[in-house]
Amino acid sequence: MRTSQDLQVCETVPELQKRLYSIRAGTVKKPKGARRYVNLTCTFDIETTNTETDGFAYTFQFCVGGICTVLRYYEDFRNALEMLVHRYRLNKNTRMVFYIHNAAYEYYYLIQLLCQDWQLIDALYTKNNKPLYFVFSNGIEFRDSLKLFQKSLARATEGCKHAKLVGDLDYSVYRTPDTPLTQQEFDYCVNDVIGLWEAIERLKKEHKYNQATIPLTQTAMVIDDINNSVRQDHKTVKIMQDLALDPVQLQIAYQCMAGGDTHGNRYKAGHTWMNCNSYDFKSAHPSQQLLQKFPTGKPWNMDKDTSEAELSAFIRHGMGWCAKCFIYQFQIKPGCPDPTISNSKCEGIVQGCTGLDNGRVLGGEGAFVYMDSNDYQRFREAYNYKALIAAAGFAFRLDYLPKSFRKPIIDSFIIKESMKGSPDYMWSKAKLNSIFGACAQKTIRDEYISAVTDAGIVNDRYSWQEKLNGVPDSRLQLHKDTGLDVKYLEPMTPEEVAKTQEKKFPFLWGLWTSSMTRLCLWQIIKIVGWDRALYWDTDSVKYIGEKSPEVEAYNAKVRAQCEKMGCVVTKGDKKVYIGVAEDEHPSIPYGYRRFRFLHAKCYADEGYNPKTGDYELESTIAGVGKKEGIAALKGNIDNLSETLYIDDAGGKMLEYHDCPIKTRSDFQRPTCTASYIRMLPRTYDMRTWKEKAANTEETLLT
């Protein structure tokens, strides 16, 4: 035993076995489930040494029901798991779950070793080598708690008795399983697992979960919460069922789906602008779901080559549509800062393309473009063009979302705005931010497959298109080359496609939420003026010069709609309206003394800080930490340029080394190691960032 703060920590398997006698743990299952779970919260973590030629774990720390253990050799950890399997009579239908915060790291180090001892019977990957969970035949299951909290371990354990300790271990020190740990290092290891245990226990208590009912992800938690309201309302269930899409409609909808509009005025890029301001929508995505009309009823297919006049008529009559459109001879209007056609939404090559602006198409002789009727309204105001038709598409009626769906949204907004500091505040805020994601989930997703061998890890990926339509001949050999069995040789049937949508929120609601937010942002860009708009990102727009009184007219309409829909929150003697465009710095004439951007997700400013009453340098550069970005600018935003190089961009770069299992004898005891990840200081070079990001995974280790 070893002491860590107020804890007695086991250092051997017999010590753990003896202490487990003090814990009584039964099994639980879902009401309609057959699988049982040991009703204990368990957590796991490792610390590693890694070099250019070698990498291994030198600590294996875990917490079972509040009892912490730190072991130094993999074989001891394996024996500990075997003891737990025997003690709790685990098997494939009776499981014990261990949570790992950012499980991809531990997975890569240990999966070959674990598979050598036990059969991997189930796993779900969100990307190559990134499991949401993985399960063995002996009943041991690992889950990624990062997806459960959607925040770093430090933030997830805030307020816990044993929160993650400040700072990181010095990863440059070469440690082995035989290296004695200082008290500080030991405490660091312990807090990583006991703190996570406390955070999950808190989550279970707040939401009345047990180990069988706790969802895998935060989004799943939100879905369960909304379902408690929605599934009791048979009328709402019928509305959602009617919105199920057939295979052709689903493919068009997936192609039309897009995120936030993040872009900068190409005429203003690379220059520093004085005296700027910003508007920011209040809860942009949830506001659309509360205030706007959404797809309802059974969608119907439009005729082939539907004319633009007919498409416009749908909009005038209060309907919406999604389509693959052909646009003939189009060109961005002079002075328009926001080319609304993303190159990723064009099918095939844009014929006669006249130019790209940070991934946006400026014009062309002709192109097939996926868009919905909201994006069409942006397009027709942004471009000059000769003709447009819908080669294929479908339409639908619009109406307000059902009250049973809107109620959890407005309830969360009320708590977020009026009950800050209450126990429900953080969950309501997270729920409000996740409701869009709950609707925007593809029911047919990319599928990642991993085959674990003694020699290494083999990965493959099937796109949602391959799953829906069957693997095309052009891709068949690529899948065969992995050595894995080829799947999805035949397209899905309409019945199979319908089944994927049965228990999900309508995908059209997620699609419509984001496109309505893009349309509202477009309206604000027009109000502040094309010549003044600088940079915008999903729900905010930065612009040059004085504040725009015209925005007040826009907000008056939003406030009136809030009153109509019962979405007004009373906060003291004030009323709060969701969806209004708020002045980011209302107390002063100019919120930004200086503003400069290069492209999407790359800007710096001198923004007003009301706490200090002064302007302060700020930076947002994708792939660079906030502090490191500010330091690199050396007090001058003009240093944000295409030649910017940052020695220390914050976080670590991960370099994957695929290795066979080997038994090594360079430690006091023989031990097995396999593949590993090398952690390197992360640098940033503006000139090569895009190329490097395509070939090397850049991850902030939290």
Q: Where in the sequence are the language-model features?
A:
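Conserved acidic
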Residues: A34-Y37, T41, E52-I100, Y107-T702
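Activation of the activation-loop gatekeeper triad in protein kinase-fold domains
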Residues: I46-E47, K282
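N-terminal accessory regions of nucleic-acid-interacting proteins
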Residues: M1-C42, I46, G260
